[in-house]
């Protein structure tokens, strides 16, 4: 057999469809059938009328209400933002004024402290200089006393040492009286 069962069944279904299409071939597609134009137009007007009233009475008021609420919210937000901006500007102005005052106070305190330190330093320097001058004068006085004592003692030391030095260097013995007369003559 050249034709299979599946092909035969398919061609049977195809044949039925073709016959059915031929039956309805003389008919017009209902929306394009002008014999029913009045009823189609009637239902079109009713449908669009219903949609118009539904949109006009339900949708548009809701949208309008939403837009109005949003506009009011935006206006209140803008007013609030302006108020907050003014408050912030006021706070910034107060902050800058207080900062300037604090800077001036800090500068005044620094100047005052600097002047006090300079005065204290001057006083301490004068006290130290006075103390050092006094100590220097005392030291010079002590040096003068020591020098005078040393000068006075030089004569007695010379009287003791010179006879021995002369004896060792020259080998001659010198009397203490002649050394004493020579030292006294050198002092005058």
From Swiss-Prot:
Keyword Transcription regulation on entry: no
Short name of any one Pfam family annotated for the protein: ATP-synt_B
Compartments, as annotated in UniProt: Cell inner membrane
Keyword terms of this UniProt record: ATP synthesis, Cell inner membrane, Cell membrane, CF(0), Hydrogen ion transport, Ion transport, Membrane, Transmembrane, Transmembrane helix, Transport
Tree of life domain: Bacteria
One Gene Ontology cellular component: proton-transporting ATP synthase complex
Transmembrane segments annotated in the record for this chain: 41-61
InterPro entries registered for this protein in UniProt: ATP_synth_b/b'su_bac/chlpt, ATP_synthase_B_chain
Function: F(1)F(0) ATP synthase produces ATP from ADP in the presence of a proton or sodium gradient. F-type ATPases consist of two structural domains, F(1) containing the extramembraneous catalytic core and F(0) containing the membrane proton channel, linked together by a central stalk and a peripheral stalk. During catalysis, ATP synthesis in the catalytic domain of F(1) is coupled via a rotary mechanism of the central stalk subunits to proton translocation. Component of the F(0) channel, it forms part of the peripheral stalk, linking F(1) to F(0). The b'-subunit is a diverged and duplicated form of b found in plants and photosynthetic bacteria.
Family as reported in the entry's similarity comment: Belongs to the ATPase B chain family.
Record-linked PANTHER family: ATP SYNTHASE SUBUNIT B, ATP SYNTHASE SUBUNIT B', CHLOROPLASTIC
Quaternary structure (record): F-type ATPases have 2 components, F(1) - the catalytic core - and F(0) - the membrane proton channel. F(1) has five subunits: alpha(3), beta(3), gamma(1), delta(1), epsilon(1). F(0) has three main subunits: a(1), b(2) and c(10-14). The alpha and beta chains form an alternating ring which encloses part of the gamma chain. F(1) is attached to F(0) by a central stalk formed by the gamma and epsilon chains, while a peripheral stalk is formed by the delta and b chains.
The protein, known as: ATP synthase subunit b 2
Organism (species): Bartonella bacilliformis (strain ATCC 35685 / KC583 / Herrer 020/F12,63)
